[in-house]
């Protein structure tokens, strides 16, 4: 990944499918989600400019932070992150996209048999969606919101596509649902030529992520699958308040292990709080638009393990509500790394098991005597990367689902010195979606 004048994050998720047992129905149960709140002021702008109505796109000028108003604040995303962090080696940098995973699981739920264990398990990943809108409407509105945000700031792009073997016929209802509610496409490729099919998929991914993800899938992924469900997220955000000062300093990976790293520094007003349960300081660094980076910095030099162990959705929500705008001296290392993970076992440990079994019920995916009702998920792979510098953050992620044939305010200045391992997440604040989350053990390691 090349260096950019911004904060970049990219995510790729791939799902690989196989064929299996028959079932009935193909819709996810109706649930609801509360509306997020992101307020913009309507008072006069600097210089005597006329007032601008709420929603008119003045995010670059004024930042009025209101924590996303939700009763549950997405427990699945935090359980996912916590499980990945606890199962990963301690010295590894980690980044995942919880939103990408949830989105592809919602797509699979559309194909699940009504009332089946498959459907129940998939629906349990969406329990934060509880308003008058159902799951479909939640994602339709969320993805439309992302599109509007991208038109203003060109910061966030989310794309989903189902690649199928050319002999596969997808259910028309499933295809129409994907297009209308999830802004997703279906494309048939010749999987009997896995090299050419992989090249086509990788070219699509590279184009969306501006070249950051060059190899989303390998020919072997294509060869063993009948479908590949892919989701890409590309984020390139500029800080509202850019860092003007950079310097070399020490980063303490542990008490006896330190390295030199490039740090950024600024003093300004930021939303900040502390959490005694997490034993950590929490800082919000806003980007232009509706996204912000939250940094969770443990009090103790070796406190990252306790921080991860105590990560809970309710505590994080409470901490966000407790944030106050105070003057903070921020010292943050630049960091840039990539990460990939097969999430199959992680999801199984979180209760999503049936989609990987021969008993999986996904009848809404395909039609035709050969594969109708006979597919299961073999793997869910995610690749992600992030680049944080003085201009902003660039992040990217992709999730691939392999589907195979079964038979085959204070005047005091707070100090926020990020010179030790920490946890971070990027939140889209109008919806509360956790776009990216992870842990930095060493800012100079690219994995």
Curated annotation (Swiss-Prot):
Question: Which keywords has UniProt assigned to this entry?
Answer: Glycoprotein, Protease inhibitor, Secreted, Serine protease inhibitor, Signal
List GO molecular-function terms, semicolon-separated.
Answer: serine-type endopeptidase inhibitor activity
Record's keyword annotation contains Transmembrane: no
Variant or mutagenesis effect after changing residue 406 to A: Fails to inhibit proteolytic activation of phenoloxidase (PO)
Q: Where is the signal peptide?
A: 1-25
- Write down the position(s) of the site called Reactive bond: 406-407
Induction of synthesis: In adults, up-regulated between 0 and 3 hours after bacterial infection and fungal infection. Then appears to be down-regulated in the hemolymph between 3 and 17 hours after bacterial infection.
The record's GO CC annotations read: extracellular region; extracellular space; perivitelline space
Q: Which CDD domains match?
A: serpinK_insect_SRPN2-like
Location in the cell reads: Secreted
Keyword Signal set for record: yes
* SMART domains according to UniProt: SERPIN (SM00093)
Q: Which domain of life, per UniProt?
A: Eukaryota
What is reported when this gene is inactivated? Loss of maternal expression causes arrest prior to the syncytial blastoderm stage. A percentage of larvae and adults, 40% and 35% respectively, display spontaneous melanization. Melanization occurs mainly around the internal organs such as the gut and fat body, but is not associated with the barrier epithelia of the body wall. Increased melanization following wounding coupled with bacterial infection. Phenoloxidase (PO) activity is increased in the hemolymph, both in mutants that display melanization or those that do not. RNAi-mediated knockdown results in spontaneous melanization.
Listed GO biological process terms: behavioral response to ethanol; defense response to fungus; defense response to insect; dorsal/ventral pattern formation; melanization defense response; melanotic encapsulation of foreign target; negative regulation melanotic encapsulation of foreign target; negative regulation of melanization defense response
What this protein is reported to do is described as: Serine protease inhibitor that functions in embryonic dorsoventral patterning and the melanization immune response. Regulates dorsoventral axis formation during early development by inhibiting the serine protease ea/easter, and is therefore important for restricting activity of the Toll signaling pathway to the ventral part of the embryo. Also plays an essential role in the melanization immune response to both physical wounding and septic infection using certain bacteria and fungi.
Quaternary structure note:
Interacts with Sp7. Interacts with ea/easter; the two proteins are covalently linked leading to inhibition of ea catalytic activity.
- PANTHER family found in the cross-reference section: SERINE PROTEASE INHIBITOR 27A, SERINE PROTEASE INHIBITOR, SERPIN
Q: Which named protein is this?
A: Serine protease inhibitor 27A
């Amino acid at each position: 990944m090349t260096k950019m004048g911004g904060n970049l994050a990219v995510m790729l998720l791939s799902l690989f499918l196989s064929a299996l047992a028959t079932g009935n129905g193909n819709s996810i149960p109706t649930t609801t989600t509360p509306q997020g709140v992101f307020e913009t002021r309507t008072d006069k702008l600097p210089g005597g400019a006329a007032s601008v109505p709420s929603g008119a796109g003045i995010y670059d000028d004024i930042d009025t932070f209101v924590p996303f108003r939700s009763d549950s604040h997405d427990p699945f995303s935090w359980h996912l992150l916590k499980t990945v962090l606890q199962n990963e080696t301690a010295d590894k940098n980690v980044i995942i996209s919880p939103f990408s995973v949830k989105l592809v699981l919602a797509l699979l739920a559309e194909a699940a048999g009504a009332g089946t264990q498959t459907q129940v398990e998939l629906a349990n990943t969406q329990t934060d969606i509880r308003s008058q809108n159902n799951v479909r409407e939640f994602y339709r509105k969320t993805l439309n919101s992302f599109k509007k945000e991208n038109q203003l700031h060109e910061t966030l792009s989310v794309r989903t596509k189902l690649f199928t073997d050319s002999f596969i016929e997808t259910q028309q209802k499933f295809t129409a649902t994907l297009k209308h509610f999830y802004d997703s496409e279906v494309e048939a490729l010749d999987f009997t030529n896995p090299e050419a099919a992989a090249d086509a998929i990788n070219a699509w991914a590279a184009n969306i992520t501006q070249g950051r993800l060059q190899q989303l899938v390998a020919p072997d992924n294509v060869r063993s699958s009948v479908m590949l469900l892919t989701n890409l997220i590309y984020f390139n955000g500029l800080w509202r308040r850019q860092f003007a000062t950079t310097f070399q300093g020490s980063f303490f990976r542990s008490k006896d292990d330190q390295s030199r790293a490039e740090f950024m520094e600024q003093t300004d007003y930021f939303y900040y709080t502390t959490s005694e349960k997490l034993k950590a300081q929490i800082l919000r660094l806003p980007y232009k638009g509706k996204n912000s980076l939250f940094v969770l910095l443990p009090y103790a030099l070796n406190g990252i393990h306790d921080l991860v162990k105590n990560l809970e959705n309710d505590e994080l929500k409470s901490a966000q509500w407790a944030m106050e705008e105070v003057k903070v001296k921020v010292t943050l290392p630049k960091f840039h790394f990539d990460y990939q993970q097969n999430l199959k076992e992680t999801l199984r440990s979180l209760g999503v098991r049936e989609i990987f079994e021969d008993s999986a019920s996904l009848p809404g995916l395909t039609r035709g005597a050969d594969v109708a009702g006979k597919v299961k998920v073999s793997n869910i792979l995610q690749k992600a990367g992030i680049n944080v510098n003085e201009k902003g953050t660039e992040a990217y992620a992709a999730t691939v689902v392999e589907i195979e044939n079964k038979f085959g305010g204070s005047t005091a200045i707070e100090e926020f010195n990020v010179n030790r391992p920490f946890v971070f997440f990027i939140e889209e604040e109008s919806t509360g979606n956790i776009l990216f989350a992870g842990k930095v053990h060493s800012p100079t390691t690219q994995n």
